[in-house]
A protein has these predicted regions:
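Cysteine-centered catalytic environments shared across enzyme families
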Residues: 1-331, 343, 347
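Glycine-rich active-site loop/lid subdomains used to bind and stabilize high-energy intermediates
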Residues: 4-9, 42, 47, 68, ...
Length: 649
């Protein structure tokens, strides 16, 4: 893998000091094994190499061969390298760097080479003959790439944002991005797929490439999930289950390819557990270990009903079953989740809402690197693919499609297993699904209405903020809490903003800690398999999350696999840690709010009367009865910290 950056000036010579500044930011903020550069007056390309796989030891980019008039670099791990090697005439045993393979494939196929690549990649190509720059993103933007068109007509691109803001120092904040962050509900920091907190700096969209000339910047789409079909046979349940497991294993096998050790960020959830189990089985055949890392509370916590607050026991059951899993239980040394806020913001370069999760992930990645791991597996996309399948989603879909016999059969089977009254369940389902049908039928027809749910946000934030246009244009629909039927599921799978955000997270964390984060549940083949699969199979015959439950009967301990009602709660002690350290934390939070109140750019966004009232009521001890209020305050705290960091840099 790599970090890539560069600048094309179509008219004037590029300032070499600006190029040096870009390089320095990568040297000081990323764990890179080598940095190579190419400079030729109006062209500058930089590339930092991470030696993750054996082929990357010989990687040397940018590639600039005068005979071809092409400057080429890529941030990539290619999963179908053997196919590409064969097409290019290499022997099976030849060790060829992935970047070199892509370069030669581009020379052979030109831009059509994108139809033959599978893996993680962001690519920059400059063609001297027609004075054109191509910037390319893979189908899910798993490697982020930013770009900025300067007022001088030049184009700057970079894996990280700061090298661009260092080269062009007067880029203003994008107020709409910050308002989106504060106004939209949920843990996503962004609602747009391509915008950033800096006006004019954009991210590449999934499955697209840019064509940049002196006159224009044009985005072209080359990937369409509707046309990308990995499986044509969903004949029956046995075929689906068997095909799914084989495909899942292939995705994991590709993900664990590395010259170093492999780690997994593991819980007892079905997605990360199965990813880890498959990885352990594959690595065991090579006499290698899987290093697993599980976050657990600092002090023991009792489960609340079906909610598992401490996953130590269940994870240990998995570890006991697979001797080559080397388990580690971590708790961030008992630190509070906002102690490392500045560090997280410096890595991510955007404000974040998942402030609870990030510090613990940083600890996992840092420890994995120290243990010699170059790949860290995750299953965070699993709820959209391998472990999708809440029973309500499939039952509602069958009901709305008028598949009443199948609906009743699934409902009866489910109720029998969980020992629930079928009569009561049927009555509740019909009432719930009729409501869902009504909500969906009027969605998009009713007048746009949206109430900001963050109590600390002032209505003044709506000034010069086209909320309706931004929500509608970016396909953000907030309706009642209803089941996800097939059409809504497919709409979600196509939602680009989620992919570009996850790409930012995985790319930047990987560069910071010297690893590559890979999620087999987000492999484009798995996304395609699930997207095109008949929806009923997600909870086939009334079995929630049927894909995993049907195909991992021997691999997952029965207490985990067959307990349909269990739900693991991650970071369960985050609020108790906040309360424990509140007397210390509230001092800084008060100072931060005073700073915000005096900042002309931010002060109009917030209701300081409510903020000060909350802080006054909780001055001595944090009341945990209203966790939503705590989160809402932390989002404001995060934005203010982000603004301060941007000022300093």
């Amino acid at each position: 893998m790599s970090a890539i950056w560069g600048n094309i000036s179509f008219d004037t010579e590029i300032d070499q000091s600006g190029c040096r500044n870009m390089r320095v930011l990568y040297e000081t903020n990323c764990k890179l094994d080598h940095i190579y550069e190419y400079y030729d007056r109006k062209i500058y390309f930089g590339c930092g190499i991470q030696e993750i796989i054996r082929e990357s030891v010989n990687e040397n980019m940018p590639i600039a061969e005068d005979k071809n008039a092409i400057i080429f670099e890529a941030d990539c791990i290619i999963d179908n390298r053997e196919e590409i090697k064969q097409e290019l005439g290499y022997s099976q045993g030849d060790i060829v760097p992935d970047g070199r393979l892509l370069y030669e494939l581009y020379l052979k196929e030109k831009i059509n080479f994108l139809t033959k690549i599978r893996g993680m990649y962001a690519i920059a190509i400059y063609d001297k003959n027609d004075d054109t720059l191509y910037l390319i993103s893979d189908p899910i933007s798993s490697r982020c790439l930013y770009y900025y068109r300067g007022t001088d007509g030049g184009i700057c691109f970079s894996t990280l944002i700061r090298p661009i803001t260092e080269f062009y120092k007067d880029i203003p904040f994008n107020s709409n991005y910050i308002k989106d962050f504060l106004v939209a509900p949920g843990l996503m920091p962004n609602i747009t797929s391509d915008e950033t907190p800096h006006k004019g700096i954009y991210k590449l969209n999934p499955g697209t490439y840019l064509v940049v000339t002196r006159e224009s910047v044009e985005e072209r789409e080359y990937f369409d999930i509707d046309k990308y079909i990995i499986c044509n046979d969903y004949t029956n349940a046995d075929v689906v289950s068997d095909t799914f497991k084989k495909l899942y294993a292939e995705c994991v096998k590709d993900a664990v390819y590395t010259s170093g050790e492999v780690a997994s960020s593991m819980s007892s959830g079905l997605d990360s557990a199965t990813t880890s189990i498959l990885a352990a089985q594959i690595l065991d055949k090579k006499s290698k270990k899987l290093f697993s890392y599980t976050y657990v509370p600092e002090n023991k916590m009792k489960n609340k009903g079906n909610k598992i607050l401490d996953e130590t026991v269940d994870v240990q059951k998995i570890l006991d079953k697979y001797p080559n899993m080397k388990g580690h239980f971590v708790n961030n040394n008992g630190k509070c989740c906002i102690d490392d806020m500045n560090k997280v913001l410096e890595i991510m370069e955007i404000p974040i809402k998942a402030y609870v999760n990030f510090p613990n992930l940083c600890e996992i990645y840092e420890k994995a690197h120290k243990h010699g791991c170059k790949i860290v597996l995750t299953g965070q996309n699993g709820n959209s693919t391998v472990s999708h399948g809440y029973i309500d989603d499939v039952l509602c879909d069958l009901y709305i499609k008028k598949k009443y016999i199948t609906f009743l059969r699934y409902l009866n089977s489910y109720c029998k297993t969980v020992k629930e009254s079928r009569k009561a369940a049927l009555k509740g389902c019909i009432r719930y699904f009729r409501h869902t049908k009504k909500v969906l039928s009027i969605a998009g027809k009713r007048k746009f209405e949206y109430e900001i749910d963050n109590r600390f946000i002032s209505q003044n934030i709506m000034n010069d903020y086209p909320l309706e246009i931004r929500f509608v244009d970016n396909d953000i629909t907030y309706v009642d809490n209803i089941p996800t039927i097939e059409s809504e599921y497919k709409r979600f799978i196509k939602h680009q903003a989620l992919y570009t955000y996850l790409g930012e997270f995985e790319t930047k964390m990987g560069l910071k800690y010297g690893i590559v984060i890979r999620d087999p549940t987000a492999d484009i083949r798995m996304i395609s398999f699930c997207y095109h699969m008949p929806y009923r199979y997600f909870a086939y015959n009334g079995v929630p999350r049927w894909l995993i439950r049907s195909s991992f009967t021997r691999e997952i301990p029965n207490e985990i696999l067959n307990n349909w009602m269990r739900y693991g709660v991650q970071n369960a002690d985050c609020y108790t840690r906040l309360r424990r350290d509140w007397k210390r934390l509230v001092v800084d939070i008060n100072k931060q709010m005073q700073t915000v109140e005096s900042d002309k750019r931010l002060c109009e966004y917030f209701d300081f009367e409510k903020i000060n009232s909350f802080l006054s009521d909780n001055q001595k001890e944090l009341d945990l009865k209203d966790e939503a209020a705590i989160d809402q305050l932390m989002y404001i705290y995060c934005v203010s910290k982000f603004y301060q960091l941007c000022k300093k840099s």
